UniProtKB/Swiss-Prot annotation:
Highest taxon of the lineage: Eukaryota
Protein name: Transcription elongation factor SPT6
Organism name: Mus musculus (Mouse)
Tissue expression as described in the entry: Ubiquitously expressed.
Location of region: Interaction with KDM6A: 317-1300
Residue ranges of domain SH2 in the record: 1325-1431
Pfam families xrefs: HHH_7 (PF14635), HHH_9 (PF17674), HTH_44 (PF14641), S1 (PF00575), SH2_2 (PF14633), SPT6_acidic (PF14632), Tex_central_region (PF22706), YqgF (PF14639)
Function of the protein: Histone H3-H4 chaperone that plays a key role in the regulation of transcription elongation and mRNA processing. Enhances the transcription elongation by RNA polymerase II (RNAPII) and is also required for the efficient activation of transcriptional elongation by the HIV-1 nuclear transcriptional activator, Tat. Besides chaperoning histones in transcription, acts to transport and splice mRNA by forming a complex with IWS1 and the C-terminal domain (CTD) of the RNAPII subunit RPB1 (POLR2A).
Sections of the chain in a coiled coil: 3-51
Record PTM Phosphoserine, positions in chain: S7, S12, S73, S78, S91, S125, S267, S1526, S1535, S1701, S1703
Region annotation Interaction with IWS1: where it falls in the sequence: 2-485
Residues where Phosphotyrosine is found: Y1515
Length: 1726
């Protein structure tokens, strides 16, 4: 409904002119309106339909003239909705008469302004319009053409499919001249926007329609209004004329002037929802279908049925034979139809060439004579049998639709080709001497011939895509040229004769606004515009020639060689898009590849080869490996390798497709074998075909060209063809698999419907008042239904012979057992049995049906059979049948709307009982109950995959089964009127449908009469000749029941299958059989007929073959089968040809009661069951003496139940005699969910020996088992629950896997998973025994997961992966940030205990509590202070980019302030990022939380305020420890062999004493650190392995000055690295902005200021070993450093006094070892 409202609410594109006709709003031309982009954009959208197709194909020349005249004047209307242009409207003075306004005012009670009224006609639109705008008009043009060719063509034919007597003759002519492309502008459902002509009678309805609506919707009307209503109707006939709107396909109503005052009335359109009217068939379209003399299904077909000439029929018959009957499917399908009994299995081989003629005859009947399939199958057998049976005829009917569609599309594409040819001719003839450009390909007769030879949709698409490749760019130009020529023609012609109009109308379809080039272009267009066509042509073969080589499998066309090297030639084509010869060649190869890939012949050959050779490879996804177990439908094809698609069976590929859609499998379809080694002869398809585009010469030039050609071929295959062909093949395989499912569903319904009504025993018929008028004709059935719910009553419904419910019964305790343990239950059961007995004796049903709900149904059946037997013995009731009936249909009916309406007061289970009774009475009628507009029939379970086929296809197939069967059985119209329950069959009668069928019944009801003869269908029901011919033979009249109730002549043949067209022959046969004299005056053929019906054996003497020859001689055609059919009918009128009812067999009962099928319940299946008890074998008397004595305990053991606590042997005997010995335990009794009982023998309980099963399982326990054996008669199964059987490593029980199953890939994946599991299970730590509330034996990930729910500052202590003498303390810095601190243990008693002393770096702790209190808690407190600071920001866990963006944004907002923020760093837990932006670029430094406070720039601050106060005072100071340098700065690496033991302190002291006086305090502290002064014993330890995170520490026994591997652009350490802490000593004065770059070297002498190659700056240095003994001469280093400072100062004297530069914290600074952009001192000071 929402779609309906939205489409109705869209803005109209039309206006009304002064005659009330709809006129399209004229859009201004693109070229004229270029100054107004917004309006232009609006026009672009207005000129597209909802699919983006241009509306330039619509005939509105005359309207445009009007529009152009109107452009100058404006009627002064108010503007339309926002965003739309002001509409220029003519003023209409006579739009509504004063009488009309009076009427409106009277109804509304207010004055109405008597201005102009404008009607809106809906405009279909789509959200896609905006998107398509940017693609440019060329794309829209292509889409429009594609729409023309490939959308459904119903529109064009839809107008002719329904006769429209009210349309004036000139409209019919206009319709023929309709735009061919307009027919393809379709709505979302694929239906043409142009509504067929039957959308007409909008305002008025007959009173019959209202009455019908009232019956359907249960609404009372004021019947007094009906007279007014009739007047109104008559008036409407005068008031309105109906016209087709050519522009939008809308029907509009043109009011004519009238003086008669209309009566106010609400139409049914106002009273009911459109969807309700549609589902009840009350719309105008439905009225038109009822009125039109064509079979209803002909009118409803999406592609209408059109008459055809003999030539076309021959061509079509041949095409249908080849495609539908002679071409085998790609996959293995059981193509044998279920009607082909005893025929070969493949339908394409059984149909010989003689079938073509039969198909042609069938098509002639369908298309030219409008006969429906059942009519042809029953009354034109001579023309179609034996080759075509009824299902084959349906197939012909379906393929006729496909043929018509293909033909129309071919015609449309041909017109397009002709237009393009004409356009090309005009272009060339304008300058005939000019040579053709490289990019132009002439559209010649071979292209037209190729289109003419197209035989399938695939080929048509190939031709169309080929056309688009070469001419797609010219389509807009062609349209604009056509438009210009039309304008010119219009100026020349003033009136124009008919011939001119015809030409104009033909051109009109391509009208449209001037088109611009597409704004976005594809790669091919770019290559084309760069002029690479010329180079592409020099590859040596045209695509057509290559295609012919490929088709003929030899080099029919030699490859031509261009006399120049490809690269040399490419230089001539170098341009801005393709700047190098290599790029040019790449572009040319792309063009050649695409041309080859679009060549129809190449595609045709490859398509055929691909389908023959295609291999299927399947691998499971990660989800699939986990989810697809042996119970899954995809288990057998979880891994497939090189399975030929030709070996796929039935619906297998649909399952594969479903598994792919669910993300379980990945499918790969390829033409070559995958992963097969050792097959040297198996060359790929590419290697096979490249020789056809190859020149066999050895010169370098030829080889270079060959290389280009080979690359082009490879690209054509890999990039275009293989992908498209695989997709195409996949869709075909899916279609075949779906068709297989649809066929299986049809077959199941066929088997249900083929069952005849139940017939009681002959004896019962004779004994009973079987034809008793009071009870109704037919058999009486008692249906018994019950629910699986506990203590739910049983309901019985008695149905008479006409299907009407005459009585019912409620039995509240009938499901209880007769042998129930409780006496009360037994008594109640007995009462119900007595009640049922009395009911059976009184009502005397012929059969009792019981619902097959579950296993209880067996018990009920036995009870009822016992009751019937007892009554039979007492001679109170003849022996009647008791049948178990599948209740699936009954449950569906019980829940349907129809049953609720029919039996509103009945409880659901009673409704189910009614359906059960009716089903056995006549399955056809009962199944038809659920085949309604609600599509309830799809709720029946036909096939496990029925939900995955196209719903419409499945419904059509099921409807066909109903149509076949109903027409075979015939429909008694009078019975349908008398008993509405059987009305559902009428719609399936040949020629009728839901609309015509109900209309027929309605007429008979209105006339309050029965149908007394078939001729009344014409005389009284006004049926047209075509519909009458189709349906007459299938509507039967019970002439016997009419009897004396009518005076009219009764035609006895009306009760037979004999068609009225052959009544004369039937009479002739009767007269001839009785040897009457036809010429006698008193000859009475009707009397002869009645006599023959009584003595049909007289007909056997007739020579029907001679009669048939005589008829053929008289021009009636071949009728010999018809004559034999007439004889059969006269022998037994409307004999039921269905299979007699039979009781279900054992297997059917098992499946019915368990709701299982062989696919769901089979040997080897894994199931779950509940233990119900232990099974024992009773002891035999002779075995008593075998009691065993236990020598150790002296006690005796029972040899059966193994009880071993008897002190004396006599007690064992007493144990036997008293019956307390249960016997030997032989197994376990279980119950499955489906009601089947299971038994597990003792030896299958376990792989170990089990003597006492009760020790292994308990009653009520759930156990996993595998089925070993199924006994369907006893509803039992033998099970095993041995581990070895459940695992089934040898695949003894599991379902067999596919022949092409890839066991190797499965084993490899399995091994990989096992390795992963082992890896995960392997603990990375030693479990410890430590008593502390914060200690947990968990790993790193588990600790972090626990931390998620803990508070900030909380601690977890856990084992360390470093070994048994380490622990890790993890504490929560903030949400998602956790610091892990390494703790070293010393003085351990054993590996699992806690060490006597604990060390973090060089700091000693006595126990874990001290670490928490003195180390972690202070840091947590300091961290909390920062987290609560007003300038704290989260920045996604310390994301530098986010922080920089925040600073830049804040700086922009407040340029005069220096913004600063702090955030926790996730990469380095325990550190915080301090970001600030004094000027243009943001700067970021680190603040580290330590137990003493905050460390920032080498200083410790005990409070946050102190930290930020100092920061604000010193933010401009240079960062200590950083050498200012260019962005390419690096650090000199530390000497590999340095060790703190070898520092020359004397030299260093001398050097330090000689330092200049102006050194900063930071410099001194840095130098002091070299001598080991000022060490902070409480430095934050490197709690991870130092090499992992890139900052060192002296903990953990590691070297105190490792050079760690760091991220890219990591500066390497300088030679002046300190022994204890990993930070860098500056090598130049920090205050000086001018500096040299240090050469990264291991020697301290390399100080040349040379730019460093980037590769060296990324070198990773080896970690120095702590046992290295080579010394570093620190004194020399310090001297050298002083010398450099002196030199630097001398340079500075020549310049101005240097200003302190801002901190060199710039973005481009290389990454420090800690991972930040600036190597900061506090990073090193760990």
């Amino acid at each position: 409904m929402s779609d309906f409202v939205e489409s109705e609410a869209e803005e109209s594109e039309e206006e009304y002119n002064h005659e009330g006709e709809v006129v399209p709003r004229v859009t201004k031309k693109f070229v004229e309106e270029e100054d107004d982009d917004e309006e232009e954009e609006e026009e672009n959208l207005d000129d597209q339909d909802e699919r983006g197709n241009l509306k330039d194909f619509i005939n509105d020349d005359d309207d445009e003239e009007e529009g152009e005249e109107d452009e100058g004047s404006d009627s002064g209307d108010s503007e339309d909705d926002v965003g739309h242009k002001k509409r220029k409207r003519p003023s209409f003075d006579d739009r509504l008469e004063d009488d009309d306004f009076d009427l409106i005012e009277e109804n509304l009670g207010v004055k109405v302004k008597r201005g102009q009224k404008y009607r809106r006609v809906k405009k279909m639109s789509d959200d896609d319009e905006d998107d398509e705008e940017e693609y440019g008009k060329e794309e829209h043009e292509k889409e429009a053409i594609a729409g023309e060719i490939f959308q459904d063509e119903e529109g064009e034919e839809g107008q002719e499919a329904v006769e429209a007597p009210m349309a004036p003759p000139d409209e019919e002519e206009e319709d023929d001249e309709e735009s061919d492309i307009d027919d393809f502008i379709v709505d979302d459902d694929g239906q043409p926007l142009k509504k067929p002509k039957w959308r007409k009678k909008l305002p008025g309805y007959t009173d019959a329609a209202l009455q019908e609506a009232q019956e359907i919707f249960g609404v009372d009307f004021d019947y007094d209004e009906f007279e007014k209503y009739n007047e109104y109707d008559e008036e409407l006939e005068e008031d309105y004329e109906y016209e087709d709107d050519e522009t939008e396909g809308e029907i509009r109503v043109r009011p004519k002037k009238t003086t008669k005052k209309r009566v106010s009335r609400r139409s049914i359109f106002e009273m009911y929802e459109p969807s309700e009217l549609e589902s009840s068939h009350l719309t105008d379209q439905d009225n038109e279908i009822r009125a039109t003399d064509l079979p209803e299904r002909f009118q409803l077909r999406s592609i209408p049925v059109k008459a055809a000439e003999d030539d076309e029929l021959e061509e079509e018959a041949d095409w249908i034979y080849r495609n539908a009957f002679a071409t085998p499917t790609i996959s293995l399908q059981d193509s044998c139809d279920y009607l082909d009994r005893g025929q070969p299995t493949s339908s394409f081989s059984r149909k010989g060439p003689s079938t073509v003629q039969k198909i042609k005859e069938a098509l002639g009947f369908m298309r030219n004579q409008h006969f429906e399939v059942p009519f042809i199958a029953f009354y034109r057998k001579e023309y179609v049998e034996p080759e075509l049976h009824i299902n084959d005829l349906w197939r012909v009917w379906q393929w006729d639709e496909k043929w018509t569609q293909l033909r129309i599309r071919k015609e449309n594409l041909t017109r397009l080709f002709e237009k393009m040819q004409a356009y090309q001719y005009e272009q060339i003839s304008a300058d005939p001497d000019k040579p053709l450009a490289d990019g132009i390909r002439a559209l010649d007769t071979t292209d037209m011939e190729r289109l003419k030879d197209v035989q399938s949709m695939d080929e048509l698409k190939d031709v169309y895509n080929h056309f688009l490749l070469y001419y797609g760019r010219d389509i807009p130009k062609m349209q604009n040229a056509a438009k210009a020529s039309r304008k010119k023609l219009k100026r020349i012609k003033e009136d124009g004769d008919e011939e001119g109009e015809g030409e104009e109308a033909e051109d009109e379809e391509q009208r449209g606004p001037e088109l611009k080039q597409a704004s976005r272009r594809d790669m091919y267009t770019i290559c084309q515009s760069a002029g690479l066509d010329g180079l592409a042509k020099k590859f040596g073969l045209t695509p057509e020639q290559f295609g012919e080589n490929l088709r003929d499998s030899y080099q029919r066309h030699e490859t031509e060689q261009f006399p120049a090297e490809p690269l040399e030639l490419a230089k001539d084509y170098v341009c801005s898009q393709f700047p190098t010869p290599e790029a040019v060649l790449e572009g040319a190869r792309y063009m050649v590849a695409l041309q080859i890939a679009r060549e129809p012949l190449v595609r045709q050959v490859l398509r055929q080869t691909f389908q023959e050779r295609a291999k299927l490879n399947i691998t499971p996804t990660k989800k699939g490996r986990k989810d697809v177990d042996e119970a899954h439908y995809a288990y057998s094809f979880k891994y497939l390798k090189n399975k030929p698609v030709k070996e796929l069976r039935d619906d297998q590929f649909l399952k594969i497709g479903l598994a792919e859609d669910e993300g379980l499998l990945t499918i790969d379809i390829s033409i070559d074998m995958k992963g097969v080694e050792g097959y040297g002869n198996d060359q790929t398809y590419f290697e096979e075909i490249k020789q056809f585009y190859y020149r066999d010469e050895f010169s370098h030039q030829v080889q270079e060209w060959n290389r280009q050609r080979t690359m082009a071929i490879e690209r054509a295959l890999q990039q275009f063809l293989y992908v498209q062909m695989a997709k195409e093949l996949k869709n075909k395989l899916l279609a075949e698999a779906r068709e297989s499912v649809v066929k299986a569903c049809s077959r199941k319904l066929y088997n249900w419907l083929r069952v005849a009504p139940y017939r009681p025993d002959q004896q019962v018929e004779e004994d009973d008042d079987f034809m008793d008028e009071n009870q109704g004709k037919g058999i009486r059935v008692l249906g018994i239904a019950f629910s699986s719910a506990r203590d739910h009553p049983v309901f019985c419904a008695l149905v008479n012979g006409e299907g009407e419910v005459t009585d019912f019964l409620r039995l509240p305790h009938f499901t209880k057992r007769r042998t129930a343990w409780r006496e009360e239950e037994r008594e109640k059961k007995a009462q119900d049995i007595e009640t049922l007995k009395k009911f059976l004796v009184n009502k005397k049903p012929h059969v009792v049906t019981i619902a097959g709900e579950n296993r209880d149904a067996q018990m009920l059946t036995e009870d009822v059979k016992r009751i019937v037997h007892e009554l039979d013995q007492g001679q109170q009731l003849s022996s009647i049948g008791v049948e178990l009936v599948d209740n699936e249909l009954a449950i569906l009916y019980m829940n349907s709307k129809k049953s609720e309406a029919e039996f509103r007061d009945y409880p659901p289970v009673l409704r189910q009982a009614v359906s059960l009774a009716r089903r056995i009475q006549d399955p056809l009628i009962e199944f038809a109950q659920v085949c309604s507009s609600d599509e309830d029939i799809l709720c029946l379970k036909f096939h496990p995959l029925q939900e995955h086929v196209v719903k419409e296809e499945l419904l059509n197939a099921l409807y066909c089964e109903f149509i076949n069967r109903v027409n075979e059985v015939g429909v008694d119209v009078n019975r349908a009127i008398a008993h509405p329950y059987s009305q559902a069959l009428i719609q399936y009668v040949c020629g009728l449908g839901p609309r015509k069928g109900t209309h027929l019944l309605k007429i008979l009801k209105q006339n309050n009469t029965r149908l007394e003869s078939r001729t009344q269908l014409v005389t009284m029901c006004h049926m047209g000749p075509k519909v009458f011919m189709n349906c007459a033979g299938f509507l039967k009249i019970d002439t016997a029941s009419l009897g004396d109730s009518t005076d009219s002549y009764i035609e006895v043949l009306d009760g037979s299958r004999v068609h009225p067209e052959t009544y004369e022959w039937a009479r002739k046969m009767a007269v001839d059989a009785l040897e009457y004299d036809e010429s006698a005056e008193d000859a009475n053929p009707a009397g002869a007929l009645e006599e023959i019906l009584e003595n049909p054996e007289r007909l056997k003497d007739l020579d029907l073959d001679a009669f048939a020859e005589e008829l053929e001689r008289q021009g009636y055609g071949d009728k010999h089968i018809t004559l034999y059919d007439i004889r059969a009918e006269l022998s037994c009128r409307y004999k039921d040809l269905r299979t007699a009812y039979r009781s279900p067999n054992t297997e059917e009962i098992f499946n019915m009661l368990t709701k299982e099928t062989p696919e769901t319940f089979y040997i080897g299946k894994l199931i779950i069951c509940n233990v119900t008890g232990i099974a024992h074998r009773r002891p035999q008397g002779e075995s008593y003496d075998q009691a065993i004595r236990n020598d150790e305990t002296g006690l005796w053991q029972c040899p059966f139940c193994q009880q071993d606590n008897f002190p004396e042997l006599s007690e064992v005997w007493n144990h036997f005699d008293s019956g307390s010995c249960p016997g030997q335990a032989i197994g376990v009794k279980t119950r499955l969910d489906n009601g089947v009982t299971g038994f597990i023998p003792t030896k299958f309980l376990s792989d170990k020996v089990v003597k006492r099963p009760e020790e292994r399982v308990k009653v009520g326990m759930t156990v996993h088992c595998r089925i070993m054996k199924i006994d369907i008669e006893k509803f039992s199964a033998d099970l095993t629950c041995r581990t070895s059987d459940l695992m089934d490593r040898n695949n003894e029980w599991k379902l067999p896997k596919d022949t092409y199953y890839d066991f190797d890939a499965e084993a490899a994946d399995h091994k990989q998973e096992e390795d992963m599991k082992r890896k995960q299970q392997r603990t990375t730590y030693i479990k410890r025994v430590i008593a502390h509330p914060s200690f947990h034996n968990i790993n790193f990930k588990q600790a972090e997961k626990m931390m998620e729910t803990m508070d900030q500052g909380d601690v977890i202590i856990r084992p360390s992966s470093k070994g048994e003498n380490h622990l890790t303390v993890t504490w929560k810095v903030s949400a998602g940030i956790y610091q892990h601190v390494d703790v070293r243990e010393e003085g351990k008693e054993n590996a699992f205990s806690l060490g006597a002393t604990l060390w973090i770096n060089s700091e000693e702790f006595e126990d874990l509590d001290e670490i928490v209190a003195r180390y972690v808690q202070p840091m947590a407190s300091f961290a909390r202070d920062l987290l609560n600071h007003k300038y704290y920001q989260d920045c996604s866990g310390g994301d530098r980019k986010k922080l920089e963006e925040l600073l830049i944004k804040t700086k922009k907002e407040k340029p005069t302030f220096i913004p600063y923020f702090i955030c926790a760093c996730k990469e380095l837990p325990g550190k915080f990022l301090l970001g600030y932006q004094p000027r243009g670029k943001p700067r970021i430094e680190y603040v580290t939380v330590t137990p003493e406070g905050f460390r920032y720039r080498g200083q410790i601050f005990p409070t946050v305020n102190g930290l930020f106060r100092w920061f604000k005072d010193h933010y401009q100071d240079p960062v200590p420890g950083i050498t200012p340098s260019s962005s390419n700065r690096t650090r000199t690496p530390a000497s590999i062999n340095a060790t703190p033991a070898n520092i020359n302190l004397a030299d260093l002291t001398r050097a330090v004493n000689a330092l200049p006086q102006n050194m900063t305090s930071q410099m001194f502290s840095a130098i002091a650190a070299v001598t080991g002064q000022g060490q902070n014993p409480n430095a934050t330890p490197a709690q991870w392995a130092s090499s992992q995170y890139g900052y060192g520490g002296s903990g953990g026994g590691s070297s105190a000055y490792h050079v760690f591997p760091t991220p890219a652009q990591q500066p390497v350490a300088t030679p002046l690295m300190t022994p204890s802490y990993s930070y860098t000593t500056p090598s130049q004065p920090i205050t000086t902005p001018q500096y040299h770059q240090l050469q990264a070297s291991t020697t301290p002498q390399s100080t040349q200021a040379q730019p460093q190659p980037s590769s060296s700056s990324r070198q990773r240095q080896q970690q120095p070993k702590s046992n290295s003994h080579a010394a570093i001469d620190w004194g020399k280093m310090a001297e050298q450093w002083l010398q450099e400072k002196e030199a630097e100062r001398r340079k500075q004297k020549q310049r101005l006094t240097p200003r302190p530069s801002p901190s060199p914290m710039i973005e481009s600074t290389p990454m420090s070892i800690a991972g930040d952009a600036t190597p900061l001192l506090d990073e090193m000071d760990r």
